[in-house]
Amino acid sequence: MKRYEITYTENGRFEIINIYGFENYVTFMEENGRYIELICIDEYDV
């Protein structure tokens, strides 16, 4: 299982703050039950 940490910004968008491991894509479930699919790149600069 890959671990992703995301944070929401004031305008409702979100950004990845940490990625542990790599995966082609990941699906997050929001509190209201909506699903968001994010495309992840092979390398991530922190």
Task: Identify the meaning behind each predicted range.
Residues T7-T9, Y20, I39:
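A structural detector for beta-sheet-dominated domains
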Residues N11-E23:
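A short, exposed loop/beta-hairpin motif centered on an aromatic-Gly-Thr core
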